Amino acid sequence: MTISHVLLKASTAIPSKDKLHPVLKDHIPIFEQMAKAAEDRHGLVTADLFGHEDWADSLCDVIEEHGASHPQFTSGVYSFPFLKPEYINDLLNEISAMSFEVNPEEDALVQIPEITLADNCRTLHDCLHSLFQYAVKPLAAILYNLEPKFMQSIQFAQYTPENTAEGHWHHDEDSDITLVVALTNNHVGGGTMVKPQGLGEVFMVPQLPVGHAMLFQGSRTLHYGLPVTEGARNLLVFWSTLRP
C-alpha cells in the first residue's frame, strides 16, 4: 500500500490562477472564445483569424510551433509557457520529499523513474488536473479539435545519464493529448525528437525553459527523449484521453 505524501506547503495543492505563467494567463479568455468557436464550426481554419486580430495575436504571443518554418498551427507539436517558475519551485520542493519508482507494467525500454500523483498525492494531482482543464483544454480544442475529458496520469519523471543512455521511439498508448512541462533546465542534453505523421521529416523540440510545456498527440506521434549526459532532467507529464 502506497503511503500518501504529506505536503510541505498546503497551498501548492490549491488550484488557483496565480500558479499559471503570466504570459499564458491573460490570454486564456481569448482561447476560451476560440475553443467555443472551434466547437461551433467543427474546427477553426486560418481564415477564421482574419476577422479576429486578437485571436491571431494571442496564438502568436503564446504558442510556439515546432516542425514548421513559420507559424501555421498545423504541425501538431507546440510549446507554451504553462506554469510560473515560482510554482515550479514549490513542486520541486515536494518532489524532494518523495521517491521515484519505475512502472513495472511499462516496456523496459521506456521505463523512467516516476512519481504518479494519483497514488502518491491525490490533492496535488487534483490541483494540477484543474489547471490543465482550465488552461490546456481550450488549446486542445483550437489546435486539435479534440476534448481531453479524462486524465489518465499526472506524474513527475526524472531523466538521468543512468536511465537514458539512448532514446527509444514510442507512442504514449494511454494518452490522446500529452503535455510535458519542464521543471528544470540545468542539465546537459535532453530535448525530444519527433516523427510527424505521414512523410514529414523528423525534427527536434529543444529543452524548454522552466515552466514551459510541450503539447502533442501522444498516441499518434512517434517521439523519444534525447539522452541526458549530465545532471537530471525533471519533467511534469500529463496523459489525457477523450474516453475513459
Q: Would you name each region that the model predicts?
A:
Residues 32-39, 45-46, 71, 106-112, ...:
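Short low-complexity stretches enriched in small and charged residues
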Residues 1-75:
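Fe(II)/2-oxoglutarate
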Residues 25-40, 64-85, 115-124, 151-160, ...:
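Charged, low-complexity, helix/coiled-coil-prone segments
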Residues 17-26, 38-42, 46-48, 99, ...:
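Contiguous hydrophobic segments
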Residues 141-244:
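Catalytic core of non-heme Fe(II) oxygenases with the double-stranded beta-helix
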Residues 51-146:
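Non-heme Fe(II)/2-oxoglutarate
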